[in-house]
Each structure stands twice: as structure tokens, then as C-alpha cells.
Design a protein with these regions (language model features):
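DNA-dependent DNA polymerase catalytic subunits
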Residues: 1-23, 32-180
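Catalytic core of nucleotidyl cyclases, primarily class III adenylyl/guanylyl cyclases
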Residues: 29
Length: 180
């Protein structure tokens, strides 16, 4: 996982590893794999569902720790004795791709404690209405395969086959244009 390129010193000291993968207005995403590997030496032997359950346990513990710290934050930083700040674990994601702010894809395996198998894509170019549908469907399928752990050779083969298909004389050129 590639982490944020530059991190303020007060979040992560220089030389320390920053496990924060993505942050926006109301969300924080962290690479929990190093912590899971540290806590569970048999991590590689666990099946995916067991890994998700262990991750959820850790996320819920940190959720409570952070929520408890919000009382101190409210009192000391905002001079507010009573507050409604709360940290909430919304979902467990097995893998994700973060391109930039509000442009990402994530494979959600648990949402608010309920088992899911959901691909959540936000803001990526191929999802836009003016993007040729033939490319949108292809990019969506490649992204899903990448997030679900397909081997590089499998993805490379699909890319080459798609290129061959797009370059063939049998393809109607109008499907390559923008729909608007």
C-alpha cells in the first residue's frame, strides 16, 4: 500500500511509518495489515472472513478509544463540557484504490457489522456519463479484479485482449466515442 506522500510532523514523526492511507472530511482509512500481522502471527493461515473479523475487532476497540478521547478534545480544544462527538466504524474494506480526494474505489466486506461483498466506486473518470461505456465497463471489471487480488498476468492478458478487440475491424467505431 502506498501511503500519503507528505505528513505533518504532529501526525507522524519523521522516520516513523505512517499507516494512514486516505483521509477526507469525515473518514479515515488505515492500513491495518501490519498491526494484524503483529497481533496474529498466524495471520497468513487465516481465511479472509477470519481476517475481516479480526480487523473489525481492532477497529471497534480504536473506535471506543477515540470516542473517549473526544471528551478531552471537546473540553481542552473547544471549551465545550458536553459534546456529541463520536467515532464510528462504518465499514471493513479488504482492499482499496485511492487516486485523490473523492476519487477512490474500495471493496467492502462488512458494512456496519453486516457482511457485504460490495464494490464502492466514487469519482473515478470511467464512471462519468461522458465516458465511453465500452471503456467504462472494461475499466470497472479490471478494477474489480485488481481489488479482489487477481494476478498481474491475468490483468495483463485481459488488457491485451481488450486492446485487440478495440483495434479490430469488426468493432463499430461509434462505441468508442463519447456518449454526449
Amino acid at each position: 500500500m502506498i501511503n500519503l506522500e507528505s505528513t505533518p510532523w504532529f501526525i507522524c514523526k519523521e522516520g516513523d511509518t505512517n499507516y494512514c492511507a486516505y483521509v477526507d472530511t469525515d473518514s479515515n482509512y488505515y492500513n491495518a495489515e501490519p498491526l494484524l500481522r503483529h497481533l496474529y502471527p498466524n495471520f497468513d493461515d487465516m481465511d479472509e472472513e477470519e481476517r475481516d473479523n479480526k480487523l473489525e475487532e481492532i477497529a471497534l476497540k480504536y473506535q471506543d478509544l477515540i470516542t473517549n478521547h473526544y471528551t478531552t478534545l471537546a473540553q481542552e480544544a473547544f471549551n465545550v463540557p458536553v459534546h456529541r462527538f463520536e467515532m464510528k466504524t462504518e465499514c471493513i474494506i479488504r482492499s482499496a484504490y485511492f487516486r485523490s480526494t473523492r476519487r477512490y474505489a474500495q471493496w467492502i466486506t462488512k458494512k456496519e457489522g453486516v457482511i457485504k461483498n460490495e464494490l464502492d466506486i466514487k469519482g473515478l473518470e470511467f464512471m462519468k456519463a461522458n465516458f465511453p461505456p465500452i471503456f467504462g465497463k472494461f475499466f470497472n471489471s479490471i478494477l474489480e479484479k485488481a481489488l479482489k487480488g487477481a494476478k498481474q498476468t491475468e490483468i495483463d492478458d485481459l488488457l491485451l485482449k481488450f486492446r485487440e478487440y478495440v483495434m479490430s475491424k469488426d468493432l463499430d467505431l461509434t462505441v468508442l466515442g463519447n456518449p454526449t
